[in-house]
Amino acid sequence: MDDLLAPNQGDLEINWQNVGPQNEKGFDNENNYTTIAYNFPGDNTIEELGMSKETKDETVNSKIKWVAFKQQFFSSILIAGNDFQNATLQYETFAPGSGNIKQFHAQLSVPYTPQTDSYGFSFYFGPNKYSTLKKYDDLHLQRLWIIGWVNRWLVIPTFDFLGKYIANYGLIILLLTIFIKIIISPLTYKSYLSTAKMRLLKPEMDKINEKYPKQEDAMKKQQAMMALYKSAGVNPMGGCLPLLIQFPILIAMFRFFPASIELRGKSFLWADDLSSYDSILHLPFDIPFYGDHVSLFALLMAVSVFITSKISYSQTAQAGPQMAGMKFMMLYLMPLMLLFWFNNYSSGLSYYYLVSNIITMGQTFVFRYIVNEDKLHQRMKENARKPKKMSKFQQRYEELMKQREQLARQQAAARNKRK
């Protein structure tokens, strides 16, 4: 290269461009996964250009190891043998219907050394499959695949194990759902038991509400409620905490199905591609935020959400006008929002949530059968008669409540003096 470049040439500029074609049914969904990613040397994380509907560019003024033009299921990756010195990255988004998703640009530089005839680079053109990318662990390419600890240690191993013996991916999703529901069933049972206890306490809670109807008595009412919970051995947050613990699994499933190349092109029942939306009816018009088709899996999933929410609210102790808005949100608005959202999303994900909700309904009926609420109520009464030793947290909480009550009285007295 010495006869082509000046001796004082500092860097070699590499101008890499590519067009990301539309490979999947849904433009918007595929566009969400299409971007430019890069990795810093020695770093086990990756950086991505943020989402933009049109053009996005970024200048990186430090060394990077590789640059990837990433799409939903496939990536083109350029890997430097001795690192790129800096980079200017840009993508431009095509209009829907053009047949393409994004135009990629990467301007990269490597240090030029006179009398050097070759520079080491590697290309990866292949699927965004975790097991394949993991083979290049020293480059951390597997980070291109959307992952978390739940997917890494639970979902992917189970999915791969079932895939060795079962060819039907609809059946694999069914068995995966059953397996996960069995694992979290102790948490589900604990949540149901806590809800049942709160429901049995409702008559006493109603009496406390009647005793302290005024807003200025809110502190006394709260103290009375806490005393009731303590005497009965009930944790008012006991029904929520198990559900919060399950939240990482819900997020993992939400990220797993649309990004798994194993589901790409795999059919089940009326769905011809479990990685994309299913359609049983094409509409002659486009409904804003919904689309121009009807996804049956999304529709059935939304119905199952409504039914499970209905069952859940039928067994809660909460009532009153303050809960009316929450009830409307959970019973009606949430299923409708999910219907609009999932209509253009992975049919495999809608199918998973549908099966999960059906199993939840079955678990609820089983728990109702095995839990004798009369005996449970009797144990709660016996527990209330036993002397209770306050924990340090409860002592501090009670002291805090007394201080807040005293402060409220002082503020009320000050207001009365000013009148």
What residue ranges belong to the model's regions?
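Long, His/Glu/Asp-enriched segments that create or flank divalent metal/ion-associated functional microenvironments
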Residues: 250-326, 331-338
